[in-house]
Amino acid sequence: MEDSAPDAVAAAPSGTPKSKLETLPREDLIKFAKKQMMLLQKAKARCTELDKEVEELKSKPVDGGTDDIIKVLTERLDALLLEKAETEQQCLCLKKENVKMKQEVEDSVTKLEETHKEFEQSHRNYVKEIESCKNELMAVHSEHSKETAILQKELEEAVHKQVELREQLKSQSDSEDNVRKLQEEIQNITAAFEEQISCLEKKLEATSDEKQQEIIHLQKVIEDKAQHYQKDINTFQAEILQLRATHKEEVTELMSQIETSAKEHEAEINKLKENRVTQCEASENIPEKYQCESENLNEVASDASPESQNCSVALQEDPSAEQTVCDKVRQLEDSLKELESQHSILKDEVTYMNNLKLKLEMDAQHIKDEFFHEREDLEFKINELLLAKEEQGYVVEKLKYEREDLNRQLCCAVEQHNKEIQRLQEHHQKEVSELSETFISGSEKEKLALMFEIQGLKEQCENLQHEKQEVVLNYESLREMMEILQTELGESAGKISQEFETMKQQQASDVHELQQKLRSAFNEKDALLETVNRLQGENEKLLSQQELVPELESTIKNLQADNSMYLASLGQKDTMLQELEAKISSLAKEKDDFISKIKTSHEEMDDLHQKWEREQRLSVELREAAGQAAQHNSELRQRVSELTGKLDELVREKSQNDQSITVQMKTMTEDQEALSSKIKSLYEENNRLHSEKAQLSRDLEALQAQQDFAHKEHVAEFEKKLQLMVEERDDLNKLLENEQVQKSFVKTQLYEYLKQLRASILEENEEEDVVKLIQAVGESLVKVKEEEHNLVFEYDARVLELENKIKCLQEDSAVQCEELRTLVRDSEQEKILLRKELDAVTSAKEALQLDLLEMKNTNEKASLENQTLSTQVEELSQTLHSRNEVHDEKVLVIEHENLRLLLKQRESELQDVRAELILLKDSLEKSPSVKNDQLSLVKELEEKIESLEKESKDKDEKISKIKLVAVKAKKELDSNRKEAQTLREELESVRSEKDRLSASMKEFLQGAESYKSLLLEYDKQSEQLDVEKERAHNFERHIEDLTKQLRNSTCQYERLTSDNEDLLARIETLQANAKLLEAQILEVQKAKGVVEKELDAEKLQKEQKIKEHVSTVNELEELQLQFQKEKKQLQKTMQELELVKKDAQQTTLMNMEIADYERLMKELNQKLTNKNSTIEDLEQEMKIQKEKQETLQEEITSLQSSVQHYEEKNTKIKQLLVKTKKELADAKQAETDHLLLQASLKGELEASQQQVEVYKIQLAEMTSEKHKIHEHLKTSAEQHQRTLSAYQQRVVALQEESRAAKAEQAAVTSEFESYKVRVHNVLKQQKNKSVSQVETEGAKQEREHLEMLIDQLKIKLQDSQNSLQISVSEYQTLQAEHDTLLERHNRMLQETVTKEAELREKLCSVQSENTMMKSEHSQTMCQLTSQNEALRTSFRDQVRHLQDEHRKTVETLQHQLSKLEAQLFQLKSEPSTRSPASSHQPSKSLRERRTTDLPLLDMHTVAREEGEGMETTDSESVSSAGTHIQSLEQLLSSPDTKLERLAETSLWHNEFTKEELAEKLSSTTKSADHLNGLLRETEATNAILMEQIKLLKSEIRRLERNQEREKSVANLEYLKNVLLRFIFLKPGSERERLLPVIDTMLQLSPEEKGKLATVAQGEEESASRSSGWASYLHSWSGLR
């Protein structure tokens, strides 16, 4: 009974899923096992003592009767029963405690979960706060950009004002007043800027002072904390002090490094500030120097002008003063040159200062980068130290787990979580404040940069004024050109109207084509949408039918399972009935046997009554012996109580030691926390010092990565710890089971051995028996010791194995962590890809919007041009018509009036003549005498009449001609009117066409609006895609949670099975103990029978045995004393062994920790040395670079001085080339516009293609994932159904077994009760009667057999009950899991269906957009090719024209050179003494020749066409080819050695002209070379464009094939079957027959067809696996 108590105690904690034993560490478990061993040994010792007492009682002489013996035995039995009840109560108490512990553990788990949730919520809140901070920063940045834009606008306005003021000042006559006003304005501006700079410097100083105060305050706080914590640190142990000392040394080194770096950084910042201040002062002094020099130059020029006049007068008067004038001129020229060189030097200084500023900014950025890298290194070091600290903390936590309970662990975990949260909060707040400070400093820097930009803009302003003057000159020339063009406009009006009509017709046709294309595209879209809707409906129907199919299958499977279960249950019931019938028959037989035995027992009872009187005497004697034994027992009990007191004292001492150790551990943890706080403070200071130089985005991303990484590490460490604890618990449970089995085995062996010894004792003498017993006990003890030693060695070996397993598990967990990290990286890469796709989509959207705006602008421009042209045409037609009408009418009226006057005159003259004739006739008749006189008059009159008639005829002819002219004029008028009417009709038609165009434009705008709506739909769909992606991520998380739940359930199932096995093993041990107790009872009964039989013999040998008993008692007492001494020695040795083991473990742990820490320290020292070496190398490199910089600066100064001379030469050439460059600019701008259009279209096409490919990839991935999920769900559903059916069958079988077992139990209990009654009767009969030994032995055998049967039945019953409970719980859990999985499966199916529909819609829209883009691309390509050809022809014409001009200019220049050389020769030959007039003549002729030459060049430049070498071409890339061609400026700036030699040899006046001519030659040759290079580039771009066209054609074909493939998506099942047949068929004719089917389904290219044909014939089987068509399989079938 005592053996069962520890077993029950051991069974109690292992029965629960999460008991104290599971949570205890390894050493506590070992201690617990040792305590159990001690208790077992005590129980064994007590059993041996009881056996000895029984033997002593047997050996004592019997004075009284057997009643005393029976009473003693009954008392013993009662005591044993009481002890059993006590043990059972203890077991119940332990169970209750176990339940309480379970509840506490569950509460703690819930608390942990709550804290974890709170931590996650806080993490989310922090992420939101970071995002809000980012948004705020972005808003501040946008505000800052707005402010900068406003300042720039203000600057531009100020520049405009300055320009206006300068123009006003130029209009004024007094230049000196203007200069003074400008100086005053500049002084005001400089004063304002100086005030701003001073304010900014004050702000900087204030911020730096605040930062320094904060740093001082923090240092004070850190010093106070350090003093406070140093007091606590001094209380630590010596080993920990040594470790911390090394740690402190490292920290101080880091601090010193940080302080030095901070000081260096501050010094560099101060240097930069000083440099900037000096730069500002220098930049402010430069304009003042310029002004002073300009004033000096003006004064010199003003002084020089009267001197030159005086000189010229003096020269005219004196020819001898020529030399002095020449000297003065030369001096003035030298002074001018010096001033110009000073001017150029000042310019160089300005540029040098700007370059210096840029270099300093670059150096500052470089320093920032270096500090950022140093900060990252320090952070890495600090992280390593923190990791080392965390490892030490984990060691400390392990020690805590050895000394504390689970509740304390949970409290510590909660406290750590809270501290981490607070730390993160503080860290976030500090970083936000640091970021704001950095932003403020950045804004101040930007302000300073703006100041420098303002100064640069001022310089640009002056340059612009110079350019303005040049533009004014150009404007005057353009004005003259415009006047010429206006005269030509009247002539070109008719041509323009005709061209306009043709353009209108072309536009109308283009608009009509575009409308037709749009309508066709919309119709195709509608058709596709209808097909998509129809397919969706069919798909939904199929999905609904598919949802019904698994339900029907599940119902069929359930019915089949029920049928099989019912059949199995029927068969089992039949077998049970048969077994019950057999049992009933056997029980009937046993009943008959029992009745016969009862009869015999009655007879024996009568005999026992007769013997009772004899045994009463013996009982008196036995009572006396019992009294002695009781005294002996009381002594033993006193000893036991003393030993228990000692044990209690030892336990107290242990508890005190534990408490002291826990206190030390707490102090250690506090010290560690103090050190961690110090490290944190140092880390925060480091962050403050370096946060000003780090970028905001990097810090935020690093923080997020660190948080995620830390969170993941914590989770991984917790999981590792849990796994290790679970594994250790399982291993220890197994070890305990093995120990219990071994103990039970040893017990059974001992009992068997004792039985054998007792059997031998009955045969041999009693004296020898005692000695043998003692020897046997000693031998058994020796064996027990050996077995214990073996067990200890086995445990050590198992411990080593467990440690190896733990290491392997740690390695596996590290591998899993790496896999998880790779997964995280993959997810981040996917995020980056998605962001890139989003950026591409947004860029495409913006490009489309820009295209729309451009189209709108072009449409508006076209409409405006149409309107202007129509108004111009109307006005012109009206003016023409009115002019024609007025002119014609006036001419006709004048002619008519003239004719009328003439006619009237003629008529009047005729009338006068007629009157005169009549008068003459009358007079002739009256006076015939006067006939002769008057005949002459008549003749004269007749001649006059004839002449008049002739004149009248002539006039009539003229009148007829005039009439004809009038008729013609009328006809022309009619024709003009008709033409006017036709023009009006044409105007009306133009207006109608305009209306049509406006309607088409409206339709186009509606199309654009529909396109906008499509874009909005696209945006919505993209948003839906994002939502679906988020859903997919959620589903993935959900699946991960499910997998975790499954793992947990499997773990729980394994735990339950292990606990089940433990319970079964313990039940077996309890049953074995019960059997042993029953065997002991039987043995006692046997001994009692033997004693009763041998009472008669013992009466005779009473006296002898009393003497022998006394001697044996003395010997026994001596042996017991020896035995107790040996026990004490054993206990001491065991305790020493335990202490030695503990010390060894502690020493090994400490040695491991110290070794790890030393390794860490060595690694850190190595890293520090490496870093120092790198820093030294970098410093050396810095020095070398500084030296290089100095040398380079010297070289730059020398080069600048040389460049100035060349620039002076180049300025004159550039002034001549300005006009040609401006003409070339327009052509190049047009070309660049075309190229930009082409590039933008290319980019749009590529983006659209990339989008299409991305969508295809996404579709393929989604479909493959869908197929995988479907297959996975199907397999999981089938597995769950199988497991459910199996578990249901098991449950039914177990229920049937439990029913049968219950029935058997009821039968057995009834039989056992009857058997008890019989046993009592038999005992009563034995008191009265004495029966023969043969009958009693037979009854005993029968009893033993029956008891064995009862034990077996009990074991079976318990097993069946346990299995029933387990199966029921498993069934419930599996059913719940099955329901949840079914629900999730249905949800997943619905979501996949919706996703498929949405993706198909998106695919349709993308395809329609792709077709539109293709058509647009083809049109643009045609346009570009035509434009390219036109440009090529124009460039070739220009090149030819330029070559001709170049030849002409070369010839003219050669002529001029020959003339000049001749003149030079003449000048040299002439004597020096010559009049001043003669000296001035050649110069005048030279100047005249120069002036005559220059217009020739100007005419050539005017005659040239556009695009011949503008400065803007230098910056613009003409082609996309990789050939590098020098720009015009580079060609012009390149020095020419021949020209310099010519310049050195010739005189000053002649050198100037030659240089100009030579430079013109070189510039023209260079421009020709430049144009040749441009032609080559255009040809290269054309070649590239042709290659791109080929690629685009191939891609279009591939896309068309892909579209045709998508038609066969509906017949995937058929395609799958065809492919499977093709794969599994042997190569030959059957495979070749399937080729056309595969070709039609997959739309293969000719190469792919050829490869498939070779595969079908049996060639290249391995190569066909990676062929083109196989790569497309995964997008439909998910085979890959």
From Swiss-Prot:
<feature type="region of interest" description="Disordered">
    <location>
        <begin position="1"/>
        <end position="23"/>
    </location>
</feature>
<dbReference type="InterPro" id="IPR032023">
    <property type="entry name" value="GCC2_Rab_bind"/>
</dbReference>
<keyword id="KW-0175">Coiled coil</keyword>
<feature type="region of interest" description="Mediates interaction with RAB9A">
    <location>
        <begin position="1570"/>
        <end position="1680"/>
    </location>
</feature>
<keyword id="KW-0963">Cytoplasm</keyword>
<dbReference type="GO" id="GO:0071955">
    <property type="term" value="P:recycling endosome to Golgi transport"/>
</dbReference>
<dbReference type="GO" id="GO:0016020">
    <property type="term" value="C:membrane"/>
</dbReference>
<dbReference type="GO" id="GO:0005802">
    <property type="term" value="C:trans-Golgi network"/>
</dbReference>
<dbReference type="GO" id="GO:0031023">
    <property type="term" value="P:microtubule organizing center organization"/>
</dbReference>
<feature type="region of interest" description="Disordered">
    <location>
        <begin position="1468"/>
        <end position="1522"/>
    </location>
</feature>
<keyword id="KW-0597">Phosphoprotein</keyword>
<protein>
    <recommendedName>
        <fullName>GRIP and coiled-coil domain-containing protein 2</fullName>
    </recommendedName>
</protein>
<dbReference type="InterPro" id="IPR051841">
    <property type="entry name" value="MT-Golgi_org_protein"/>
</dbReference>
<feature type="domain" description="GRIP">
    <location>
        <begin position="1605"/>
        <end position="1655"/>
    </location>
</feature>
<keyword id="KW-0007">Acetylation</keyword>
<feature type="modified residue" description="Phosphoserine">
    <location>
        <position position="1475"/>
    </location>
</feature>
<dbReference type="GO" id="GO:0034067">
    <property type="term" value="P:protein localization to Golgi apparatus"/>
</dbReference>
<dbReference type="Pfam" id="PF01465">
    <property type="entry name" value="GRIP"/>
</dbReference>
<feature type="modified residue" description="Phosphoserine">
    <location>
        <position position="1479"/>
    </location>
</feature>
<dbReference type="GO" id="GO:0034499">
    <property type="term" value="P:late endosome to Golgi transport"/>
</dbReference>
<feature type="region of interest" description="Mediates interaction with RAB6A">
    <location>
        <begin position="1570"/>
        <end position="1609"/>
    </location>
</feature>
<feature type="modified residue" description="N-acetylmethionine">
    <location>
        <position position="1"/>
    </location>
</feature>
<dbReference type="GO" id="GO:0034453">
    <property type="term" value="P:microtubule anchoring"/>
</dbReference>
<comment type="subunit">
    <text>Homodimer. Interacts (via GRIP domain) with RAB6A (preferentially in its GTP-bound form). May interact (RAB6A-dependent) with ARL1; might be involved in GCC2 Golgi localization. Interacts (probably via GRIP domain) with RAB9A (preferentially in its GTP-bound form). Interacts with CLASP1 and CLASP2; recruits both proteins to membranes of the TGN. Interacts with STX16.</text>
</comment>
<dbReference type="GO" id="GO:0042802">
    <property type="term" value="F:identical protein binding"/>
</dbReference>
<dbReference type="GO" id="GO:0005829">
    <property type="term" value="C:cytosol"/>
</dbReference>
<feature type="coiled-coil region">
    <location>
        <begin position="31"/>
        <end position="1614"/>
    </location>
</feature>
<dbReference type="GO" id="GO:0005654">
    <property type="term" value="C:nucleoplasm"/>
</dbReference>
<keyword id="KW-0333">Golgi apparatus</keyword>
<dbReference type="GO" id="GO:0006622">
    <property type="term" value="P:protein targeting to lysosome"/>
</dbReference>
<feature type="compositionally biased region" description="Low complexity">
    <location>
        <begin position="1"/>
        <end position="14"/>
    </location>
</feature>
<keyword id="KW-0813">Transport</keyword>
<keyword id="KW-0472">Membrane</keyword>
<dbReference type="GO" id="GO:0090161">
    <property type="term" value="P:Golgi ribbon formation"/>
</dbReference>
<dbReference type="InterPro" id="IPR000237">
    <property type="entry name" value="GRIP_dom"/>
</dbReference>
<comment type="function">
    <text>Golgin which probably tethers transport vesicles to the trans-Golgi network (TGN) and regulates vesicular transport between the endosomes and the Golgi. As a RAB9A effector it is involved in recycling of the mannose 6-phosphate receptor from the late endosomes to the TGN. May also play a role in transport between the recycling endosomes and the Golgi. Required for maintenance of the Golgi structure, it is involved in the biogenesis of noncentrosomal, Golgi-associated microtubules through recruitment of CLASP1 and CLASP2.</text>
</comment>
<dbReference type="Pfam" id="PF16704">
    <property type="entry name" value="Rab_bind"/>
</dbReference>
<keyword id="KW-0653">Protein transport</keyword>
<dbReference type="GO" id="GO:0070861">
    <property type="term" value="P:regulation of protein exit from endoplasmic reticulum"/>
</dbReference>
<feature type="compositionally biased region" description="Polar residues">
    <location>
        <begin position="1469"/>
        <end position="1484"/>
    </location>
</feature>
